[in-house]
Amino acid sequence: MESDQSKVESDQSKMESDQSKVESDQSISQSTSKKRSQYSLRLEAKQRLRFNYGVTERQLLKYVCIAKKARGSTGQVLLQLLEMRLDNIIFRLGLSPTIPGARQLVNHRHILVNDQIVDIPSYRCKPNDIITVRDHQKSQELIKRNIKLAKIDEIPSHLNISYLEETKPKGFINKIVDRGSIGLEINELLVVEYYSRQA
């Protein structure tokens, strides 16, 4: 009888041990799943931001590093840096239907900033900068076509545009863009966290 009782207790102890192991495995699995889920959210936010502004991995990392050193919210500064790129400003002004198209305008020297040709798409614009089109027939024909394609309904509040003629737009930067004027629905802090955890 004692031997049978001992066997029952041994089996019960083994079952409890197995149950404990299963619970432990489930806990580890849930923890891993949660970590993976958080990582995938950060990765998705980073990819969306890259796609939206058409920047490379290296460029985005550089902007994150600059934003971390600046005063204010790192996420907000990051968005401001991306929004104030020349190619993005041209797109927001409605001078190109896409950011890649705006980048091409800059690369091909069709755009002037404060009456100087700028051929660097990542050029950081600042308040009071004036964006115009080169006084060249090809440049003006491109802009005329782009304006028809872009069909911008509303210019963001940090920008302004006027037309001396249909082919001679004049863009003006009123101020640094604020978060409310950025139409992108994204949690920029997830992007900052993504790069913080990669370091």
Curated annotation (Swiss-Prot):
NCBIfam families: PRK05327.1, rpsD_bact. Its main location: plastid. GO terms for cellular component: chloroplast; small ribosomal subunit. This is Small ribosomal subunit protein uS4c. It comes from Psilotum nudum (Whisk fern). GO terms for molecular function: rRNA binding; structural constituent of ribosome. Pfam families: Ribosomal_S4 (PF00163), S4 (PF01479). Residues 1-35 are annotated as: Disordered. The lineage of its organism: Eukaryota, Viridiplantae, Streptophyta, Embryophyta, Tracheophyta. Residues 84-146 form the S4 RNA-binding domain. Keywords: Chloroplast, Plastid, Ribonucleoprotein, Ribosomal protein, RNA-binding, rRNA-binding. PANTHER family: 30S 40S RIBOSOMAL PROTEIN (PTHR11831), SMALL RIBOSOMAL SUBUNIT PROTEIN US4M (PTHR11831:SF4). GO terms for biological process: ribosomal small subunit biogenesis; translation. Transmembrane segments: none annotated. Part of the 30S ribosomal subunit. Contacts protein S5. The interaction surface between S4 and S5 is involved in control of translational fidelity. The keyword RNA-binding applies. One of the primary rRNA binding proteins, it binds directly to 16S rRNA where it nucleates assembly of the body of the 30S subunit. It is found in: Plastid, Chloroplast. The keyword Ribonucleoprotein applies.
